[in-house]
Amino acid sequence: MSTFTTDEVARLANLARIDLTPAELERYAGELEVIASAVARVSEVAGDDVPATSHPIPLTNVWRDDVAAPTLDRGEVLASAPEAADGKFAVPQILGEE
């Protein structure tokens, strides 16, 4: 039995703006259960004596000198935009529905 309900999967799909059929909701509920089980198994194995890591090898940043250079004119950039308002790109609102 899945611990993920089709209602939960439908809510996640809605947040991601993905339309799913009822069959897909059922399928993804099962797939999410498999993923959650795998994460639970890893959590059981990882002990307090194992240090947390984000990369298997050490990483260092390679910085370049911050040199001022000419940039594009705002008008030129906005001229190629599909829509602009008040000197800025105008885009459709996507947040605030939930």
Curated annotation (Swiss-Prot):
Q: Which UniProt keywords apply?
A: ATP-binding, Ligase, Nucleotide-binding, Protein biosynthesis
Write out the similarity annotation: Belongs to the GatC family.
Instruction: List where the protein spans the membrane.
Output: none
* Xref: Pfam families: GatC
Q: Which InterPro entries match?
A: Asp/Glu-ADT_sf_sub_c, GatC
Known role: Allows the formation of correctly charged Asn-tRNA(Asn) or Gln-tRNA(Gln) through the transamidation of misacylated Asp-tRNA(Asn) or Glu-tRNA(Gln) in organisms which lack either or both of asparaginyl-tRNA or glutaminyl-tRNA synthetases. The reaction takes place in the presence of glutamine and ATP through an activated phospho-Asp-tRNA(Asn) or phospho-Glu-tRNA(Gln).
Fetch the Gene3D superfamilies from UniProt: Glu-tRNAGln amidotransferase C subunit, N-terminal domain
Instruction: Write one Gene Ontology MF term.
Output: asparaginyl-tRNA synthase (glutamine-hydrolyzing) activity
- Which transformation does this protein catalyse, written as a reaction? L-glutamyl-tRNA(Gln) + L-glutamine + ATP + H2O = L-glutaminyl-tRNA(Gln) + L-glutamate + ADP + phosphate + H(+); L-aspartyl-tRNA(Asn) + L-glutamine + ATP + H2O = L-asparaginyl-tRNA(Asn) + L-glutamate + ADP + phosphate + 2 H(+)
State what protein this is by name: Aspartyl/glutamyl-tRNA(Asn/Gln) amidotransferase subunit C
The Enzyme Commission number assigned here is 6.3.5.-
A biological process (GO) of this protein is: regulation of translational fidelity
Organism, scientific name: Beutenbergia cavernae (strain ATCC BAA-8 / DSM 12333 / CCUG 43141 / JCM 11478 / NBRC 16432 / NCIMB 13614 / HKI 0122)
Keyword ATP-binding in annotation:
yes
Complex formation: Heterotrimer of A, B and C subunits.
